[in-house]
Amino acid sequence: MNKYRQKLVTFGGGTGQFHLLDGLRDLNETSFITSVASTWDSGGSSGRLRTELGVLPPGDIRRCLLALMEDKEQRKVAQRLFDDRLEEVSGPLRGHSLGNLITARLDNIYRGQDRGIDAERKLFRINAKVLPATLTDVELIAETSSGLKISGETNIDYRVKDKDFDPKDKIVRIYFDSRTDTNEKVIESIRDAHKLIFSPGDLYTSILPHLLVDGVSEAINKSKAKLIIVLNLATKKGETDNFKASDYLKAFSFYLGGGNRIDYLIINDNHLDAEIVETYRNEGQNLVEIDEEKCIKIAPKMKIIKKDVAMYLKNDHLLRHDPVKLAEAILSL
């Protein structure tokens, strides 16, 4: 199969970026793909390694590396290895993801996460590039409409579990606790790209923080690459409650310094069963409503691309982007 040879740069974190890369890997030459991974995770195995070893959080980097392995059988084995958690051991290693430990250890051995990632790419024969968003150890802070300040990505993520949580107290601003050093390799990749893609994912804790990193939004605004945003399928409780498509675009526009830079918004347009809608509603989430007129007012030059890009994992009751369909939609633009 002939593959596309588009220079692509993706920004994101979590499962959203994983599924995006999973599709792009099979349809585009991987040596033309650069994935920028988030590095401000403060919880779980990643957060512990960050505290205990002084490394940048390895979780999202691990996911990107896994998604970009081209050999299917190798990827299957690596997934079992990377996702294995050491629950049967006692002591400080208990609960750690083995993949996180490998990434963190290479960081220490090669004296820097960027060099450690390159070593891991060689180890697993990964042609695509994976870059940390920043090499600075930073804490993400969110401010709500009441003036409440929440420090740490995990604390922002889990604020819904607080007994005093008020869904009307919305996040209005995010920032880092200190200035971030620019990762020049990220800036170079943006400069050389044909397409810049923001993956689906947690808006305020995974996606928008990329635009807080020094030099990134400026480089995007100077770039001639097409800027593509993949709209989330559903809202997230405590983060994007009752958000419509225009609310997502407002947030992007704010951190980009205006909506004129956005070229494409990819949305799902296939019919989703009432069962799916009800399942998500019971979890305090809604499918994202598309208010086209407001979207165009925010980003006048933007084209809305409507495609069947969703899949429902019935056994897990999860709505996800279909990797291949999403990649096809992006590469065809």
Predicted regions and their residues:
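Metallocofactor- and cofactor-centric catalytic cores in central/energy metabolism, strongly enriched
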Residues: 2, 15-18, 26-28, 32-35, ...
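Charged helix-capping and loop-helix junction motifs
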Residues: 210-217, 243-248
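Short internal beta-strands
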Residues: 33-39, 226-233, 263-272
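Non-transmembrane, aqueous-exposed alpha-helical and coiled segments at domain scale
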Residues: 1-7, 22-25, 31-32, 40, ...
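Electropositive, gly/pro-rich neighborhoods at or near active sites that engage anionic ligands
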Residues: 38-166, 329-332
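A short helix->loop->beta-strand "cap" motif at the edges of active sites that frequently abuts
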Residues: 29-31, 223-227, 262, 300-302
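An anion/phosphate-binding loop that grips the pyrophosphate of nucleotide cofactors and donors
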Residues: 193
